[in-house]
Amino acid sequence: MYELPAYLVWGFLESGKSTLIKETLNQDYFNDGEKTMILTFEEGEVEYDKEMLEKTNSFVVNIENMEDFTKEFVRGCQRNYYPDRVMIEYNGMYSIDDLMDVVDETDLELYQVIVTVDASTADLYLKNMKSMFMEMFKMADLVIFNRCDDNTNMGSFRRSIKAVNPRAQVGFERADGKE
């Protein structure tokens, strides 16, 4: 059909994926009138309101089951909606291989992989689900730790990511909005 730029926003439940997508869509540099399809693989804490979607020429397609995400599904979305780009809000509990199999079989062209991490739970995830966490970091172009505070061990987190992906950019955002 046609090459379809895709931005993968990946992380565990309530790690800030929807918030990042909403903030990105509302930025002038990104909101240039292109039609954006948001594929969501979970229902999180933050919802996409109708006004924001209209303002940013965006729409949401919810995928209830991973089995529903197929090359036929993607091609059907292209035929029915004619999006200019796709933002994929992907749950960190799902296998990335399943997603990449479909990406490789379709016109989706992965432009950027962003991983969001709730810094207040990152230590727990690193201890209990290290392999899943590291899998996300391996593919990431950008890792954003949000909800940071004075006790966030930024150096340790940065080293963990750089050990598996030296090219990844790592950013930290404080919960209180301070620099």
Residue ranges and their predicted role:
Residues 75, 128-130, 178-179:
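Short, surface-exposed amphipathic charged segments that create phosphate/polyanion-binding patches used
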Residues 1-6, 166-179:
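Long, charged, low-complexity intrinsically disordered regions
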Residues 2-10, 15-123:
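Nucleotide-state-sensitive switch-loop elements of NTP-binding domains
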Residues 16-17, 153, 177-179:
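Conserved GTPase G-domain signal focused on the G5
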Residues 85-165, 169-172:
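Phosphate/Mg2+-binding loops and adjacent switch elements
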